[in-house]
Design a protein with these regions (language model features):
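Sec-dependent signal peptide cleavage junction
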Residues: 18-63, 70
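Helix-rich interaction surfaces within compact, conserved domain-sized segments
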Residues: 25-28, 127-197
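Bacterial Sec-dependent N-terminal signal peptides
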Residues: 1-26
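Well-ordered beta-strand positions
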Residues: 63, 94, 101, 156-158
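N-terminal post-signal-peptidase region of extra-cytosolic proteins
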Residues: 55-56, 73-89
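Extended beta-sheet lipid-handling architectures
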Residues: 64-66, 71-73, 88, 95
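Solvent-exposed coil/turn segments that connect beta secondary-structure elements
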Residues: 74-76, 96-98, 105-107, 145, ...
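Mid-length scaffold segments of soluble, non-membrane domains
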Residues: 83-137
């Protein structure tokens, strides 16, 4: 009788262990399937973002070639590393044909010469050059001459995105500044231009 009870106890214990292992392996397989689904979803989302970013890049490159673009700045960087976050609709560098506009407007109580808190200068663009390096990054440069401006403007746009930096370097002083933001074709831009000098 003792042997039968001992044998029965061993069988029940062994069956319980097997069931626990089966439950663990089923749980492990479910977790692995969930992990694979999340990984596939993340890869699809990244591919969609990359496709959208590349489309914006191609659009921006064509706008540079057509000389019909606007760089809407989200941030303005000054000479010694200080910077300010700004409103993209009122801070921009644009070009349409051979005419260029540079506008800087801060959010404050002072209206400035352009009526919106800063300065707007128009000028004629010359010495326009566009280059693509071996990695596909774009550089675009021009000289802007006008009533209130005489400066060189250099754009840098990395491959695969329409994020761009335009550095404005005045010819008569060293107070350069950089506009950092997104570059769009003029018809897709939503900027407000103040009074120019």
């Amino acid at each position: 009788m003792k042997k039968v009870l001992l044998l029965l106890a061993v069988l029940l214990f062994g069956a319980g262990s097997m069931m626990a292992q089966q439950d663990k392996s089923a749980e492990k397989a479910a977790k692995q399937a969930e992990k694979e689904a999340k990984k596939a979803e993340k890869a699809a989302k990244k591919a969609a973002e990359d496709a959208e970013s590349n489309a914006l890049f191609e659009q921006a490159v064509q706008a540079l070639k057509d000389r019909d673009f606007v760089l809407e700045a989200e941030r303005v960087e000054f000479k010694r590393g200080s910077f300010a976050y700004v409103t993209p609709s009122t801070n921009f560098v644009s070009m349409k044909g051979n005419k260029a506009t540079i506008q800087l407007a801060f959010n404050g109580s002072f209206s400035g010469p352009n009526g919106i808190g800063g300065i707007t200068v128009d000028g004629n663009a010359s010495n326009v050059e566009m280059k693509t390096d071996k990695k596909g990054n774009i550089t675009f440069s021009m000289m802007v001459q006008g009533v209130g401006v005489s400066a060189s403007v250099n754009f840098r746009m990395p491959k695969g995105t329409n994020k761009c930096t335009a550095t404005v370097s005045p010819n008569f002083n060293s107070n350069r500044m950089s506009f950092v933001g997104n570059l769009y074709p003029s018809e897709q831009s939503n900027v407000y231009k103040g009074r120019s000098l």
